[in-house]
């Protein structure tokens, strides 16, 4: 967000797809790799400058193609390469040292922490900092504050105490997610289909260890966040659909493109359906209009 606030997208001529990749957890497909490379080139950087580490693409077909071609896995395949590339450009723009952009004490990371605190409505001094899987600082928040942040992200107009530049940056990030869902996630992924189905009414994004967060702009402003306690990934999407169903967000029922995620099948080695994943745990919901941002933060654990 500090990069967009400072006019980085305009300064480096980033496309909508490149902005979307900068806020993505992508699946490492060839189009994602090419987009990350394009971001880097616009700032005079290369894959060698990324500090996210080399990983296989999470997209199985793409990973198999890399192995089949005898190519090494690259930091560009890392699902966070887009945001790392954008951080390098932010350093170039703001005059910061790009070699240590992942250090929690780096001035760019301090700016990012301040924006997280602002949108979450939570003091920066109370946010604990760890190290994420991609080596960037990761911020520990109450789950209700993550929900509040997503409500603020999709809120119309300007928020209280939000600068015009910050509001413009926020709207640009959200607009990119809506316009380029594939670049936020990947082929066939839930988040891609979820963004497409929303048609501008909501955004959503997964996090590691069973986290999912949603910002709903219509039919009413809502922020939703939850974490699967044991960190499992497979319950996230049925839980997300179940919460939205309970809140009456779907108009005309669950979109057809998401119907397979309502109760995903568990298949055995022969492809026989032997079970299903069911969202069956009540979700705690609470709204705190006095302390939180506009909209209802809905938080839960499953």
Set out the residue ranges of the language-model regions:
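Secretory/export targeting leaders with adjacent low-complexity proregions
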Residues: 136-139
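Glycine-rich ThDP/TPP pyrophosphate-binding loop and its adjacent helix/strand module
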Residues: 125-128, 149
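Generic secondary-structure signature for well-ordered alpha-helical cores
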Residues: 9, 41, 45, 93, ...
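Active-site-adjacent helix/loop patches that line small-molecule binding or acyl-intermediate pockets
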Residues: 14-126, 134
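Structured C-terminal helix/loop/strand segments within mature extracytoplasmic catalytic/sensor domains
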Residues: 151-302
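General structural feature for long, well-ordered alpha-helical segments within catalytic domains
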Residues: 32-36, 84, 108, 112, ...
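Active-site SXXK
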Residues: 1-9
């Amino acid at each position: 967000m500090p990069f967009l606030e400072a006019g980085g997208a305009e300064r480096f001529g980033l496309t909508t797809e490149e902005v979307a990749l900068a806020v993505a957890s992508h699946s490492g497909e060839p189009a994602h790799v090419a987009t990350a490379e394009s971001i880097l080139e616009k700032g005079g950087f290369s894959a060698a400058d990324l500090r996210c580490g080399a990983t296989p693409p999470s997209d199985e077909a793409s990973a198999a193609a890399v192995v089949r071609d005898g190519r090494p896995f690259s930091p560009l395949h890392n699902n966070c390469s887009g945001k790392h590339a954008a951080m390098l450009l932010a350093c170039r723009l703001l005059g910061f040292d790009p070699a240590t952009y992942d250090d929690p004490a780096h001035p760019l990371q301090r700016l990012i922490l301040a924006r997280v605190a602002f949108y979450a409505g939570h003091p920066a001094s109370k946010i604990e900092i760890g190290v994420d899987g991609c080596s960037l600082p990761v911020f520990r928040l109450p789950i209700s504050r993550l929900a509040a942040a997503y409500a603020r992200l999709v809120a119309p107009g300007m928020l209280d105490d939000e600068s015009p530049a910050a509001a413009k940056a926020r709207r640009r990030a959200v607009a990119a997610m809506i316009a380029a869902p594939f670049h936020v996630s990947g082929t066939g992924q839930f988040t891609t289909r979820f963004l497409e189905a929303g048609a501008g009414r909501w955004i959503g994004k997964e996090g590691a260890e069973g986290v999912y967060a949603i910002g709903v702009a219509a039919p009413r402003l809502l922020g939703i966040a939850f974490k699967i306690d044991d960190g499992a990934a497979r319950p996230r999407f049925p839980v997300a659909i179940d919460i939205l169903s309970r809140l009456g967000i779907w108009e005309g029922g669950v979109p057809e493109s998401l119907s397979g995620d309502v109760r995903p099948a568990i298949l055995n080695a022969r492809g026989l359906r032997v079970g299903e994943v069911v969202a069956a745990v009540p979700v705690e919901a609470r709204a705190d209009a006095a302390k939180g941002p506009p909209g209802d933060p809905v938080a839960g654990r499953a």
